[in-house]
Each structure stands twice: as structure tokens, then as C-alpha cells.
Amino acid sequence: MANAYKQAGVDIEAGYEAVSRMKKHVQTTMRKEVLGGLGGFGGMFDLSKFALEEPVLVSGTDGVGTKLMLAFMADKHDTIGIDAVAMCVNDIVVQGAEPLFFLDYIACGKAEPSKIENIVKGISEGCRQAGCALIGGETAEMPGMYSTEEYDLAGFTVGIVDKKKIVTGENIEAGHVLIGLASSGIHSNGYSLVRKVLLEDGELSLDRIYGRLELPLGEELLKPTKIYVKPILELLKKYEVYGMAHITGGGFIENIPRMLPEEIGAEIELGSWEIQPIFSLLQEVGKLEEKEMFNIFNMGIGMVVAVKEEDAKDVVRLLEEQGETARIIGRTVQGAGVTFNGGTAL
């Protein structure tokens, strides 16, 4: 039977075209340490030029979750790849690691070359923001597993850090200052609840602007996750950072304690930073309690850094010079967990 594979739902020619289209985007991410080109069985990266006493490789892998469903609904696929990169590289930079390279995995029901190109275009943009090379990936066409409009997206990154410079959080003490770096919005966590609250129960339209939002709801929800790699690496060159937390699923409540010793807690000052209107809209439409919001979403802070009190103002200044919005949002205390002081945040 001629074209048997195509009749089974797998279009090899479309796959070849997708690879051809993505090459120009991938090329923009290359670093001098990358060996070989796109299309090999494995990606290669030369570590011989890194002048580190005890080099340690740090790896991370993650996906975008159900934020993908918003991309399907809006038929917008050119930024979702930034989210995939951000979720991985932000996780390893909190340990002091410089991301070196990234690999992606795209699984789809139907390989549409233009859509695949847009996804990889976003991945490449994320890699450029993080300074890492896109050295490989897999695009799997799986008819019957996914509908023709659906795909899943995941990524994997590897970074490097000198062993003595790994940021562990183990030396954090009571009295250290917590500095928050602003998020771009919801980032890539909590979208199952977002869809239920705003789209299913609230029946809001992706095309309309609600409340204090400055963009249509769909554009607001698809804002890419902020990548903090370059400002954090710059910070690590100049100041001692005792701990860092990437605020992802579990919000403040789960993620800040991940960087703290067992006997140390965090005291957060509500009102010390601006919380974006999208979170107010979510709480209002979903009638969600404030504590639940902080247990699910980043609430306007995508990264938290712990430093000495005497360095805090200078650290904020450096981060602002790097283009970040940074605020002192609290401090570490004797105890455990995360507590909140001040008035209502939303």
C-alpha cells in the first residue's frame, strides 16, 4: 500500500519540512561550545574551556502544563516555547548554575510545519534570553494520542556551577532580607484553576479587556514566563546570595521554604510590591481566599533572593539596573513556614 504511514496519520514529509523551518531559529541560539549541527543523533557541548575548580552539572526538566490549552484556544504558538525554557532554566539558576544548553520535546497529533516552527521560534527566543544553546529535540507525531490541534511541550536543560559556588540556602539565618523580582503575570502554573474560574465558571471572553487589565484576557494569560537567568548571574558575580526560590506551583507557601533551613521561616510584608490586576480578577471572579491565592500563584513575584541586610539596597539597585523590578518583600525569621504581615495584598 503506497503512502501507508501517511494514511495511518503520520506525515513524514511534513516532519521534514518542520525541521527545515526550525533550523534558522535554532541557529540563533548557538554558543561556541556547541559541536556539530542540528540533525545528529545526539547534541554535543564542549566543557573543556570552563575554568572551574570543581565543575558541577545541574539539570532541570519541566513542561508548560495546561497553559497550552490557552495557546490552542487562541491559536497562538510563538511564545509558549519561552515558557518551556523559563520553567527549566529558572529552576537551575536558583542553585547558581549558568544554563548551557536546552533540549525540547514536542508531541502532537498532526505535524503542521508552520505551527511547529512557531513553537520552536519561541523556544529559541527563550534560549537566547537565558544564554543557552538549543542543541537538540524531538518532534513526535502521534495520531490517536492527541487530536490534530493538540500538542504537548516539555524541555530539559543542563547548567554548570563551581561546587564551592552552589547556592544551597543552608547558611540562611534569621534576619536575612528577602528580595522579590517581579513576575510578568501568572507565568506557567495554576492554569487548570484559571480556566475553570475565568473561562468555564466565569464565562469570560479571551478577546475582551476586563477590570484593570491593559490587554485582552487571552493576551494577558499567554504572557510568557519571565526568565531571570542573566540578572541573577550578574548578581552572583558581585554579591553573596544565601538562597533563591523560583515561585512556581505552590506559590509563596511551598516554594520559599524550599530554600530555607528547617529552623528558619519567612515573614512577608504584604503591600511591599505591586500585584498585577490579573490576580485581583481571579480572586474576584473565583471568590478565592487570599491564602489560597498565595498557595497557588506567584502573586506578582517570580523569584525570591535572600541576602544580608547590609547588601539589600545595593542588590535591589543592581537588579533594577539589569531591567528587573525588584522590591524588599520581607525577611527570614526563627521558626518555620511563611507568614504574612500587613494589610490585604489584593
Swiss-Prot record:
Q: Using the record for this protein, list the coiled-coil segments as residue ranges, or answer none.
A: none
**CDD domains listed in its UniProt record:** PurM (cd02196)
Recall the GO molecular function terms of this protein's record: ATP binding; phosphoribosylamine-glycine ligase activity; phosphoribosylformylglycinamidine cyclo-ligase activity
- Give the enzyme's EC designation: 6.3.3.1
Q: Which InterPro entries match?
A: PurM-like_C_dom (IPR010918), PurM-like_C_sf (IPR036676), PurM-like_N (IPR016188), PurM-like_N_sf (IPR036921), PurM_cligase (IPR004733)
SUPFAM superfamilies documented for this protein: PurM C-terminal domain-like, PurM N-terminal domain-like
Q: Which GO terms describe its cellular component?
A: cytosol
Give the UniProt subcellular location, in the record's own words.
Cytoplasm
Protein's UniProt keywords contain Transmembrane: no
Keyword entries, A-Z: ATP-binding, Cytoplasm, Ligase, Nucleotide-binding, Purine biosynthesis
Listed under catalytic activity are: 2-formamido-N(1)-(5-O-phospho-beta-D-ribosyl)acetamidine + ATP = 5-amino-1-(5-phospho-beta-D-ribosyl)imidazole + ADP + phosphate + H(+)
Q: In which pathway does it act?
A: Purine metabolism; IMP biosynthesis via de novo pathway; 5-amino-1-(5-phospho-D-ribosyl)imidazole from N(2)-formyl-N(1)-(5-phospho-D-ribosyl)glycinamide: step 2/2
Does the record bear Cytoplasm in its keywords? yes
According to its UniProt record, this protein's enzyme class is ligase
Q: Which GO terms describe its biological process?
A: 'de novo' IMP biosynthetic process; adenine biosynthetic process
What Pfam families does its record include? AIRS (PF00586), AIRS_C (PF02769)
Q: Which PANTHER family match?
A: TRIFUNCTIONAL PURINE BIOSYNTHETIC PROTEIN ADENOSINE-3, TRIFUNCTIONAL PURINE BIOSYNTHETIC PROTEIN ADENOSINE-3-RELATED
Q: Which family does it belong to?
A: Belongs to the AIR synthase family.
Matching NCBIfam families, A to Z? purM (TIGR00878)
Stated name of the protein: Phosphoribosylformylglycinamidine cyclo-ligase
Q: Which gene encodes it?
A: purM
